[in-house]
A protein has these predicted regions:
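The serine-hydrolase catalytic nucleophile loop
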Residues: 96-109, 131, 260
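Serine-hydrolase catalytic core
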Residues: 69, 77-79, 224-311
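Conserved alpha/beta-hydrolase
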Residues: 107-129
Length: 313
């Protein structure tokens, strides 16, 4: 009883110090949790950018295609750029805080070599509402896009290629691990688990150095995505890609994602290729860097997934 009384009405110096430290720790934890929660909200609700094009005058004869995403995720609008009849279809999966409109030059480079190309916006990007799960549910959007295109009579339903950057790379790789229609992959700055992208988001907000901030943000993100708590890291199913050519692109100016990409490459089965670039994020490259990047991506697909036509339905 004396101990409880002393804790309630501290009179000794060490008891007062203990109570002060306890209060400090409590408020520090409370502040960290609150800030982490706010950061996660900003991460899953990124600032959206939307691009529109004049379909009648834009080069490449684009066509608007709409498709439903299962699980109540709503309708997506995509732009389809036709290539050679029966040639493979390349789906471009944009990165976090990006949009389909920022990939039009990469699209043109692929279409110029007779590939069919399709681009769309993920949830919480472009004109789409919702929140981003950093890959958990975005893979369903990629699957819905593949299903839509595979049903077209002018396309080969068995030959698809995927290109993706960070968020898009995660969704593309997750889809390829379970879909034999995916015949080639280009993965730029891919991560193994979405919580790794949360860490990147915290660090980009300048709070990565605060004690326990990354951990608190990760826990908040996992709580929001509790339904996916059993989803394994991508690296656990990489053997499903045996025989699927994959190009891993590391960007040295993004050390965190460069390291995760390197680790994924080391664990990946053959055939695999690695490209190490000084700068990443295609949409932020200068014109010369974009041309070099486009040439690398197009060359990979030309060798690994030739743009030859096949008999279609």
């Amino acid at each position: 009883m004396q101990i409880l009384y002393e804790l309630r009405y501290p009179t000794r110096w060490y008891t007062k110090l203990l109570m002060a430290l306890s209060a400090l720790v409590f408020f520090a934890v409370l502040a960290t949790t609150a800030i982490a929660g706010f950061l996660v909200y900003r991460i899953v609700k990124p600032q959206r950018t939307s691009s529109e094009i004049n379909m009648a005058s834009f080069p490449g004869r684009p066509e608007v295609l709409n498709f439903e995403v299962p699980g109540g995720l709503g309708t997506r609008e995509g732009w389809f750029f036709p290539g050679f009849r029966g040639a493979p279809t390349i789906i471009l999966c944009h990165g976090y805080e990006s949009s389909r409109g920022e990939l039009l030059t990469l699209e043109s480079a692929l279409q110029d070599h007779q590939y069919n190309v399709f681009i769309f916006d993920f949830a919480a990007h472009g004109a789409n509402a919702g929140i981003s799960t950093l890959g958990y549910r975005e893979v369903d959007e990629v699957r819905a896009a593949v299903d839509l295109l595979a049903a077209r009579p002018d396309l080969d339903p068995t030959r698809f290629g995927l290109w993706g950057y960070n968020l898009g790379a995660y969704a593309a790789l997750r889809e390829a691990e379970r879909d034999k229609r995916i015949r080639a992959l280009v993965l730029d700055s891919v991560y193994d688990e979405p919580k790794q992208m949360v860490k990147v988001g915290v660090e980009r907000n300048g709070l990565g150095g605060f004690p326990f901030m990354v951990r608190a943000a990760g826990l908040s993100f996992e709580y929001l995505n509790y339904a996916h708590r059993e989803d394994p890291p991508l690296s656990q199913k990489l053997l499903a890609l045996v025989g699927v050519p994959t190009l891993y692109i590391q960007a040295l100016d993004d050390p965190e994602l460069a390291e995760t990409t390197r680790q994924m490459f080391l664990k990946a089965p053959e055939p695999r290729e690695q490209a190490i670039l000084p700068h990443g994020n295609f949409v932020s490259l200068n014109d010369e860097e974009k041309r070099a990047y486009e040439n690398r991506v197009v060359s990979f697909f030309l060798v690994r997934l030739p743009a030859s036509g096949m008999t279609v339905r």
